[in-house]
Amino acid sequence: MSNFILKPGEKLPQDKLEELKKINDAVKKTKNFSKYLIDLRKLFQIDEVQVTSESKLFLAGFLEGEASLNISTKKLATSKFGLVVDPEFNVTQHVNGVKVLYLALEVFKTGRIRHKSGSNATLVLTIDNRQSLEEKVIPFYEQYVVAFSSPEKVKRVANFKALLELFNNDAHQDLEQLVNKILPIWDQMRKQQGQSNEGFPNLEAAQDFARNYKKGIK
């Protein structure tokens, strides 16, 4: 369990925020994931976790309700077609429940826990490395999570997996596959259509942008 508990409405102390950032900066440089886990346990006073079949089933139930498989797209001038499509797994939790985020790190052996910007004490675990998503996250979902999921969420997992396979086949380097295969999956999976923080308002806008970018029309 975690012995670090905040009261309702209480903010995560600044020293904890700074230490968390320092820990994340360190693992980015060293790639020492074992030390990263140790540092997180120390920071949030988390007891060591044993990964068992039962804990995996517990995590599966939690992820089914709380986690997200997302695909975002944004303009990037240095990319081949002027935009990038980014798949990501994430799950948020109040710091009082940090142990379940830590359990996910132990199970997946990858990921980062950061403070959610603008929140009092919400943490977010993200995994955005495509190889890790394909080799660690998706197999876990297929083995443990989809059995408890709605048809809509099962389809979402399938779409996410299909996107990763397209990336593996370098479809993002081919204009026609980007436009006709990758971007339609992104469009299907968007949860926040019409939000101002999206790179493109709809599928057609993203497709037209990619086509015209290659022609020098931005």
Swiss-Prot record:
The keyword Hydrolase applies. GO terms for molecular function: DNA binding; endonuclease activity; metal ion binding. GO terms for cellular component: chloroplast; mitochondrion. Pfam families: LAGLIDADG_1. Residues 71-75, 90-94, 114-116, 191-199 are annotated as: Interaction with DNA. It comes from the Eukaryota. The record marks 21, 80, 130, 172 as: Interaction with DNA. Mg(2+) 2 binds at residue 86. Mg(2+) 1 binds at residues 65-66. Its cofactor is Mg(2+). One of its GO terms (biological process) is intron homing. Its EC number is 3.1.-.-. Keywords: Chloroplast, DNA-binding, Endonuclease, Hydrolase, Intron homing, Magnesium, Metal-binding, Nuclease, Plastid. Its main location: plastid. Transmembrane segments: none annotated. Binds 2 magnesium ions per subunit. A third magnesium ion may be bound between subunits. It is found in: Plastid, Chloroplast. Belongs to the LAGLIDADG endonuclease family. Endonuclease involved in intron homing. Recognizes a degenerate sequence of 17-19 bp to produce a staggered cut 5 bp downstream from the CeLSU.5 intron insertion site. Homodimer. This is DNA endonuclease I-CeuI. It comes from Chlamydomonas moewusii. The lineage of its organism: Eukaryota, Viridiplantae, Chlorophyta, core chlorophytes, Chlorophyceae.
